[in-house]
């Protein structure tokens, strides 16, 4: 999942894949929503945690999908999965994600304000009304609640410090 987010980011996609024959594993990183423990402060550490979680879950044929920070974590994990890795998919990501200093500082001082900044940028000007084309859904409100209760600043700093994307990508053989 992306910075400050959790498994709910993948609710609709998880459902689709599950109904099309895939076993879906969409974990919350430690310190995020339903996961216990302290937040992991580096993308490398998050990738190692994911590899261990996949092993504990008994995953053998692995298709990794990651959004933003989640792709960096998936990339780290993918570089050490070997033949178990079947595909790796990036959604709105890159091999490095330097985060604006103002956003990081805002998220450190006020997770709510940091979440608001990300949501405004992510959803654009039409998000100001807070409505959704999907009945019963309020992605801005839901996103604000999730991000402000998770370690957003820790995640943003981890993204900023991550520099191993190219090397990890070179190690992946699918």
Spell out what each predicted region is:
Residues 4, 29-33, 95:
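Alpha/beta-hydrolase active-site loop signature
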